[in-house]
Regions:
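Soluble extramembrane regions of membrane proteins in the secretory/endomembrane system
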Residues: 46-69, 74, 79-81, 160, ...
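Compositionally biased, proline/threonine/alanine/serine-rich low-complexity intrinsically disordered stretches
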Residues: 23-99
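Bacterial N-terminal signal peptides that target proteins for export
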Residues: 1-9
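Active-site SXXK
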Residues: 105-111, 125, 131, 157-183, ...
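Short, conserved catalytic-motif segment at the N-terminal edge
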Residues: 96-157, 179-181, 192-195, 232, ...
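Short, surface-exposed loop or secondary-structure junction motifs
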Residues: 139-143, 198-427, 453
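Peripheral terminal and inter-domain segments
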Residues: 445-720
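Bacterial N-terminal signal peptides
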Residues: 8-19
Length: 720
């Protein structure tokens, strides 16, 4: 989740106004792979912000899409030569290999279009098939000042959560060797100081729960997952001790993506092997596989307790990360992730990732070197639990992808604040696709390229949009409602972000289509099969939704990616409820303070109790207004996710939370005073009935707002 509160507020307004379907009835694009998880607390990466294009200075911002470094044969840009059509309608049969020239022309068109549209500084791509590198190419710039082009053989991109796949390979090697059991409690393989606490749950978290992301942890990241100031960097041991997430459900219940869980897996492997994690990965995977331009280490000065730095020859070739602004590309500081290295600290080149995909497609063997055995190879192609048709599962840590044409693959997506990457291998095509971008707006390209390649060459054409269903219109109430994702923080200030951005509103429109709306936008779906089964497919692609039904009503649903479950949520967790109460509270508070100056004091009478109650309510009004203003100031700075991630929670949000806490506490006092307020009704020196009614309504409004803020974690400034 890119935590832009602008997007959050836009989502809330959308929820308040009602769901609006996107214009998906246009000519359908090639079906993209569902957006994958990123190593920070986002449920999904938010949509690309719409920003005006800016003129580029010649030396500082060269047009990234205009330059490419390639090892594949050149072809006319944007021209895809015609291929014969197979009986299925696909351009190639499964046994046929991709023509390099046609593939390069197609990828060139997709990448350069995305770079121009989304303002991406640099992209690196590699495609392998049947043991050969079919395409290896760099586009744009790894650095804009000084200018340095992307070299697919030398330029390292941060691959984010793709790092986890190396962790799962290391873990499966220990399982194959018999030193770790997949069904054993994780605590057996952790030092006592890092062992998972019960926290009220009797069932222990097992190794397999880490591999399918079902340990039952909440997901927290703000203020600690990334670090830009190396002086604040901690060892992995220290990080895992200090940033323990709460256990919010029993292990094995549902998959809910967990960076902390992946880090525990890496720590377990390190503890059992007796080697530091970075060295273990180098000795057991990277060096034997010939991946000499890949590293989990990071550039930094020597520091006690921190793994050694990345070799200088590699550090000099790491790409810069960028953010697009109206004035041009803005370079990001280096993102340190070494404290949770198994979850996301790897950097690699397109060439090395090509070797890695060949390793995965060849069952753990490359150039005669066996990195992992047949047991692990089979595990990475076998889902750990059954999922509904079209919903991705977990293949012992690897993501199972549903691709166009009914094909499946496995791999992983990844992202940092600036880098967006994806790697997908498709065994029945002998195909692997890797792509990484160095700008925060590169998510659409990264998540969609592999699916576009498969769809372009190996899937028959489809007719879109799919028509709606009259039966769905009749059963709309069974599905409509507000659903909240399980991948979020459950307490404290960080829960604000999860509640504000992690929900989805489900409606049925007049054309018999299911419409899902969240802060990323809206999508439309139609039933696939019997409505009682709760399966839906996109009106314009191959993406699926699967609802869990009970007593004829939807209880929850899973998106195509399957990294979390969306459960029906009460109205108090709906952002529209919080927004409505916030507006009403602001109006009431302003009216209360205005009343101090507008009332005619010569005609105003009140009892001592009413005088004290009025004073308390005036203080409350000032606190509520201060809280709302400070929250607005905090929100105004969140257009850049770095401000949220590195500056969490920040003084504005902290003071706003403290004001809300005091105001909520004073609400208890005014509630207790309500009976005494009304008992003074017949005295001359008492409030009028209208004044008493206004006071009472305001008390009840403040009380409702305080209760909702408690559910949202706003009343705990100490737990940022």
């Amino acid at each position: 989740m890119r935590l832009t509160i602008k997007a959050v507020l836009a989502a809330v307004l959308t929820l308040c106004a009602g769901s609006v379907a996107l214009a998906q009835d246009q000519a359908a694009p090639a079906a993209p792979i569902p957006a994958g998880p990123v190593p920070y607390t986002s449920l999904e990466r938010p949509a690309r912000p719409v920003r005006p294009a800016a003129p580029r200075p010649a030396a500082i911002r060269p047009a990234p899409a205009a330059t490419a470094t390639s090892t594949a044969p050149t072809a006319p840009i944007g021209v895809v030569p015609a291929l014969p059509v197979t009986p299925s309608g696909a351009r190639l049969a499964p046994a046929e290999t991709l023509p390099p020239a046609e593939l390069e022309a197609f990828v060139d068109g997709v990448v350069r279009s995305a770079m121009a549209r989304d303002h991406i500084a640099g992209v690196t791509v590699s495609v392998v098939q049947n043991g050969q590198v079919v395409l290896k190419k760099g586009y744009g710039f790894a650095s804009l000042n000084p200018a340095r082009k992307v070299d697919p053989d030398a330029t390292l991109f941060r691959v984010g959560s793709i790092s986890k796949t190396f962790t799962w390979i290391a873990l499966m090697k220990e399982i194959e060797a018999g030193r770790i059991r997949k069904d054993a409690p994780v605590n057996l393989y952790l030092p006592e100081r890092l062992q998972i606490r019960d926290q009220g749950f009797r069932t222990p978290v097992r190794i397999v729960n880490l591999m399918d992301h079902s340990p039952g942890f909440e997901d927290r990241a703000l203020g600690h997952l990334f670090e830009r100031n190396f002086a604040r960097e901690r060892s992995m041991d220290e990080y895992l001790r200090q940033e323990r997430p709460r256990r919010v459900r029993a292990p094995g219940e549902v998959a809910s993506y967990s960076n902390y869980g992946a880090a525990l897996a890496g720590e377990a492997v390190s503890y059992v092997s007796g080697k530091p994690f970075e060295r273990l990965i180098e000795e057991s995977i990277l060096l034997p596989a010939g991946m000499r331009n890949t590293s989990f280490r990071e550039p930094h000065e020597p520091k006690s307790g921190i793994p050694g730095a990345i070799p200088r020859r590699l550090a000099a070739n790491i790409s810069e990360g960028y953010r697009w602004t109206p004035s041009g590309f803005e370079a990001r500081p280096f993102e340190h992730i070494g404290h949770i290295a198994p979850a996301g600290s790897a950097s690699s080149t397109a060439a090395d990732m090509a070797r890695y995909m060949q390793l995965l497609l060849n069952g753990g063997v490359i150039d005669g070197a066996t990195i992992y055995g047949p047991g692990a190879a089979q595990a990475f192609r076998t889902p750990l639990r059954k999922t509904p048709a079209g919903i991705s599962g977990w293949r012992h840590g690897f993501i199972e992808y549903s691709l166009p044409g009914g094909r499946t693959g496995f791999g992983h997506a990844g992202g940092t604040l600036s880098f967006l990457s994806n790697m997908v291998v498709v065994p029945n095509l002998g195909l692997g696709v890797f792509v990484s971008t160095n700008t925060e707006t590169g998510g659409d390209l990264a998540m969609g390229l592999a699916g576009q390649v498969v769809g372009q060459f190996y899937a028959p054409p489809q007719a879109y949009p799919r028509p709606g269903s009259e039966a769905l219109k009749d059963q709309a109430r069974a599905f409509e409602g507000y659903y909240l994702g399980t991948r979020r923080a459950y307490r404290g200030l960080e829960s604000i972000v999860g509640l504000a951005t992690g929900g989805t509103t489900v409606k049925v429109d007049g054309r018999g289509r299911l419409v899902t709306t969240n802060f990323l936008g809206a999508k439309t779906w139609v039933p696939e099969g019997d409505l009682a089964e709760g399966r839906f497919i996109s009106t314009t692609g191959s993406e699926h939704l699967a609802f869990k039904m009970g007593d004829g009503r939807a209880k929850s649903f899973q998106g195509a990616f399957g990294d979390q479950t969306f459960e029906r949520a009460g109205f108090w967790k709906n952002p529209s409820t919080a927004m409505t109460l916030a507006i009403l509270t602001g109006v009431a508070a302003a009216a209360t303070l205005a009343g101090i100056f507008l009332r005619n004091r010569r005609e105003f009478r009140e009892t001592p109790v009413q005088s004290r109650a009025s004073l308390i309510q005036n203080i409350q009004a000032a606190l509520w207004l201060t809280m709302l203003i400070l929250f607005g100031l905090w929100a105004s700075r969140t257009g850049d996710i770095a401000n949220v991630m590195y500056g969490w929670p920040g003084p504005f949000l902290f003071i706003a939370s403290a004001c809300a806490l005091v105001a909520a506490a004073l609400t208890l006092a005014t509630l207790l005073l309500l009976p005494a307020i009304w008992r003074g009704g017949r005295r001359v020196d008492s409030w009028t009935p209208l004044r008493k009614l206004a006071f009472s309504v305001t008390v009840l409004l403040y009380s409702a707002f305080a209760v909702v803020l408690w559910f949202w974690g706003v009343l705990s400034p100490w737990s940022g």
